[in-house]
């Protein structure tokens, strides 16, 4: 007895259109494929067991025997088909593969500070203070001096995180502060001037004084100075040094007090301890305020002067809370967090 031929189907390549030609009650149920799968020609097999997870064809006719078909799509050997329908069913999303992670380069590839190996010296001195504790100015300075263990005299540094964004002109901060007790180091000053200003600069204690000949020396690579001061009438010629002095932070500017008609006063101020500071792109100001061999009272006076200068020169575009955090540290030591309220309310002694 001849058996009846199975119903015919019309199939195509990697397509979502399957057409049953004879029985309209024939239903298809599609399940997601990986996006990087490559399909070959589809083959049709008649099986009595359950279908695979790609495409199911089931006849809904009321017949004694249900007819099930399984359509098997051949994929590349390396492709793995994942059952994502249950995960994406509720949200109705489409299953996608995560994009491959690109390897990090440069500073981004470095481990986090918490994952780096600290020296034994650093780990020992770090135990002297609590990490999240906020200290008043006097206690913080005392701890900073206790945690100094290097073979050289470290610099005391203040680090203030401010609620400003320097990419906006009205939120930039660049100013100077005169430290009453000095910086603790010798500053070598060069002056660009002409005429009588040259004699005034030499009398005030400038280390290097010159005019156009000094400009030519700087173009030739001469950089043996820490600060460059220029008179206003020399700025047209100094402009040609922008590419050389700018990246080093030595370009004279009025905001820094290095472009002035009174060169003698400027030389004296920088010799005594005038420090220039500016906010970096992350909104943090870094200011040195002395050496660790200073007395605590002298460091306190200098630190108070830096705080007052940052507060006085608050940008006009700063909004909300201006001070976000404040820390002090030595050059090679851990930072000590300051209590901002006590820091701003501190009143120096009248004899300071």
Curated annotation (Swiss-Prot):
- Which positions form the organelle transit peptide? 1-72
Source superkingdom = Eukaryota
- Predominantly, its location class is plastid
- Provide the alphabetized UniProt keywords: Chloroplast, Plastid, Ribonucleoprotein, Ribosomal protein, RNA-binding, rRNA-binding, Transit peptide
PROSITE patterns recorded for this chain?
RIBOSOMAL_L1 (PS01199)
Task: Please give the start and end residues of each transmembrane region.
Answer: none
Q: Which cysteines are joined by disulfide bonds?
A: none
Q: What biological-process terms (Gene Ontology) are attached?
A: translation
GO MF assignments: rRNA binding; structural constituent of ribosome
Q: Can you list the GO cellular component terms from the UniProt entry?
A: chloroplast; large ribosomal subunit
Places the protein is found: Plastid, Chloroplast
**Which region ranges are annotated with the description Disordered?**
82-113
- What role is this protein assigned? Component of the chloroplast ribosome (chloro-ribosome), a dedicated translation machinery responsible for the synthesis of chloroplast genome-encoded proteins, including proteins of the transcription and translation machinery and components of the photosynthetic apparatus.
The record's note on quaternary structure and interaction partners says: Component of the chloroplast large ribosomal subunit (LSU). Mature 70S chloroplast ribosomes of higher plants consist of a small (30S) and a large (50S) subunit. The 30S small subunit contains 1 molecule of ribosomal RNA (16S rRNA) and 24 different proteins. The 50S large subunit contains 3 rRNA molecules (23S, 5S and 4.5S rRNA) and 33 different proteins.
Query: Per its record, how is this protein called by name?
Result: Large ribosomal subunit protein uL1c
Organism lineage: Eukaryota, Viridiplantae, Streptophyta, Embryophyta, Tracheophyta
Gene name of this polypeptide: RPL1
